[in-house]
Amino acid sequence: MSEQIQSVGRRKEAVCRLYLTPGSGKWLVNGRTLGDYFPRPTLVSAIQQPFTLTDTLGRFDVKATIDGGGVSGQAGAVRLAVARALVQVDETNRKKLREFGLLTRDAREVERKKPGRAGARKRFQFSKR
């Protein structure tokens, strides 16, 4: 496998276009390193989970372009894109990644604010008198 593998991951409003090439484990996220772009260690470990589950950590170089969303949504988008790319690399990875739910797109979105209310569910303060 010497060619570049391309995949897409989405979470909330974030979209990640990811390119996976055989290499030494270098990460480039929007032109920055993984630890620089995602300073929280929990997000970094969540992003690298597909690699650790399939024992491929450090075997691929990753270039990711992320648009939209917040930090958590972007991390989820990268994680899904990595998992999808690893399935393209080797179909036997599918069973393990599916078992841990890494190939399922998280469909939860923000519920819209309703008229006459403070938020999606919250009401304005009720006064009896």
Swiss-Prot record:
Gene3D superfamilies: 3.30.230.10. It comes from Gemmatimonas aurantiaca (strain DSM 14586 / JCM 11422 / NBRC 100505 / T-27). It comes from the Bacteria. HAMAP family: Ribosomal_uS9_B. One of its GO terms (molecular function) is structural constituent of ribosome. This is Small ribosomal subunit protein uS9. Belongs to the universal ribosomal protein uS9 family. NCBIfam families: PRK00132.1 (NF001099). GO terms for biological process: translation. Signal peptide: none annotated. The keyword Ribonucleoprotein applies. One of its GO terms (cellular component) is small ribosomal subunit. The keyword Ribosomal protein applies. PROSITE patterns: RIBOSOMAL_S9. Keywords: Ribonucleoprotein, Ribosomal protein. InterPro entries: Ribosomal_Su5_D2-typ_SF, Ribosomal_uS9, Ribosomal_uS9_bac/plastid, Ribosomal_uS9_CS, Ribsml_uS5_D2-typ_fold_subgr.
